[in-house]
Amino acid sequence: VETHFTNGFDPEPRARLIFNVPRPGTLARILRDAEADPHRPTWRAKVQNLPALDTAPLRPAQIEAINGVEKSLAAQQFDRSLIQMATGAGKTYTAVTQSYRVLKHGGFNRILFLVDRNNLADQTLAEFQNYRTPDDGRRFTELYNVAKLSKAGLLGSTKVSISTIQRVFKAIKVG
């Protein structure tokens, strides 16, 4: 049996295959969000109306990458986003900037940041800890909980989970 769900508040409502019936709390949140922001009630509407990007701290390739990802999100082309940059070009900073934008303005609740080596997980965590937001200069980690995925799991309040591909695979396989 297939179950489909249509969120009538989406900018282009359409039936989507779902694997679980939404919980009453989830449906209540959808209604609250629509009432609180009728012009941008869903994350799909929010990513189509993101505020202008503060380009001052960014390099041209980073600006192009962020604009490209946001264009893909707005067009709902989730399988067509790839950031490819040279070593040292600021991929992690670009991803942290994008993470901040979609958490603050895009209606995203959580982000999984995958790396292929443990030392990259540590570097990524440091990049999130050092990132200063463009609007008020606060550190990313003052606003959002960022943590590396461990054997113990994550707190429910974690907004950005950093993990190696191997750890995620192990968690899926065991869980």
Give the ranges of each region predicted by the language model.
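Conserved motor-coupling elements within RecA-like helicase/translocase cores
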Residues: N145-S161
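Short, solvent-exposed loop/turn elements at domain surfaces
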Residues: K170-I172
